[in-house]
Amino acid sequence: MNNNKIKIIGGGLAGCEAAWQAAERGVAVKLHEMKPERYSPAHHLPGLAELVCSNSLRGESLDNAVGLLKEELKRSGSLFIAAALATRVPAGGALAVDRQLFSDYITEKITNHPLIEVVYGEVAQIPEEGIVIVASGPLTSDRLAASIATHTGNYLYFYDAIAPIVTADSIDFGKAFRASRYGKGDGDDYLNCPMDETTYKAFVAALLGGDKVAAKDFEKVVHFEGCMPIEEMAERGPETLRFGPMKPVGLPDPRTGVEPYAVVQLRQENRDGTLFNLVGFQTKLTYSEQKRIFSLIPGLEHADFVRLGSMHRNTFINAPQLLLPTFQLKNTPRILFAGQITGVEGYVESAGSGFMAGINVARLAKGGALTVPPPTTALGALVHHITSVDTKHFQPMNVNYGLFPELGGKVKKKDKRARLAERALTDLTEWQGMVQD
């Protein structure tokens, strides 16, 4: 009987959520967790679903997409959300938890479920047969990573280099102009924020004086030239950025016909053109400093940053290259991935991916049709993004309203998020009715 069980590698947020969802649908699960036999450098608690960084699950308001995602998971019977609500601590408008009680809650639920068997010990390779979910997290062990690489080839990464992303409707197009360097491509593939000499020097000075995030011992990264933090490039000399990611050559401002002193380029992040990332602006600046300093860029003074930059240890796959929207490997559909290893960023997003993977392995085991939530929902928007964006520039992403399809007709900006949330919950209810197991 054990050979027929769904195998889930990793007892973190995604793995536990996937195990719960599959078991609740009548499918037997074997959940593998390497603790307490072996700990990663970031883990300390012996239980399942350990929160290794902050104890905050971020805001609850539907004005934030992560709040909507939590509401969708709550309405869908998520173990992760049930645990969070049962172990919450005061945190203003955020949902924060007692991390020990949170882990204890999930460990108790998982270990006492009649259809879940927890096996402790490291899994060194993906099983050669049967349905498997890989949810081994950002600190996947070296041996398992080597096994994963046999299925993913060169599309497995060990460090992320995330540049900030802003919403298109928050960019001042009176200052930014569209153009590609030397008119290549379609000629207007990039947004360009021009700087004069005074603005550039003030910007570099701000970068050099900005507060940085201290790296943890297990996150010591050797930076390659093409992946250097923007502030470390600035440390090489005052003109370095002008001859690197901010070089103005081949980008004359159409309003003056003259090349600016320096240029910050923004590249379209999604097909709908609602999001743009700051090209080459991977950074270790703190989030508050990023908002302050990057708002000095002409055209971004009032930018809405939906993702801020970071660089840290993070094992993840190139999801749009490798995964179907069902979280199955395209070339080996019996294998699914879930959690941060898929390129979702954040606790709630990891649990959400585990939720979907768990539903789909249950359907796969029963011979049913697999399912994907509508892209108008927070779950669906996130899934759609990580499995459909440009494979060349893929980096982990958190849920945000910039991922959602636009609303039809004119909507006031102050009402937009409420309307997006209302549409999402309506479409979620309809989808739930269609996929009742």
Swiss-Prot record:
Annotated catalysed reactions: uridine(54) in tRNA + (6R)-5,10-methylene-5,6,7,8-tetrahydrofolate + NADH + H(+) = 5-methyluridine(54) in tRNA + (6S)-5,6,7,8-tetrahydrofolate + NAD(+); uridine(54) in tRNA + (6R)-5,10-methylene-5,6,7,8-tetrahydrofolate + NADPH + H(+) = 5-methyluridine(54) in tRNA + (6S)-5,6,7,8-tetrahydrofolate + NADP(+)
GO BP, one annotated term: tRNA wobble uridine modification
This protein's UniProt keywords: Cytoplasm, FAD, Flavoprotein, Methyltransferase, NAD, NADP, Transferase, tRNA processing
Enzyme class of the recorded protein, top EC level: transferase
Keyword hit for Metal-binding: no
Main location: cytoplasm
The EC number(s) this enzyme carries: 2.1.1.74
Gene Ontology CC entries for this record: cytosol
Amino-acid positions noted as binding FAD in the UniProt annotation, renumbered to this chain: G10, G11, G12, L13, A14, G15
GO molecular function per UniProt: flavin adenine dinucleotide binding; tRNA (uracil(54)-C5)-methyltransferase activity, 5,10-methylenetetrahydrofolate-dependent
Location in or out of the cell: Cytoplasm
Cofactor: FAD
A Pfam short name: GIDA
InterPro entries: FAD/NAD-bd_sf (IPR036188), MnmG-rel (IPR002218), MnmG-rel_CS (IPR020595), MnmG_N (IPR040131), TrmFO (IPR004417)
Keyword Transmembrane on entry: no
Family note: Belongs to the MnmG family. TrmFO subfamily.
Function: Catalyzes the folate-dependent formation of 5-methyl-uridine at position 54 (M-5-U54) in all tRNAs.
UniProt xrefs under NCBIfam families: gid_trmFO, PRK05335.1
Matching PANTHER family: GLUCOSE INHIBITED DIVISION PROTEIN A, METHYLENETETRAHYDROFOLATE--TRNA-(URACIL-5-)-METHYLTRANSFERASE TRMFO
Protein name: Methylenetetrahydrofolate--tRNA-(uracil-5-)-methyltransferase TrmFO
Species: Geotalea daltonii (strain DSM 22248 / JCM 15807 / FRC-32)
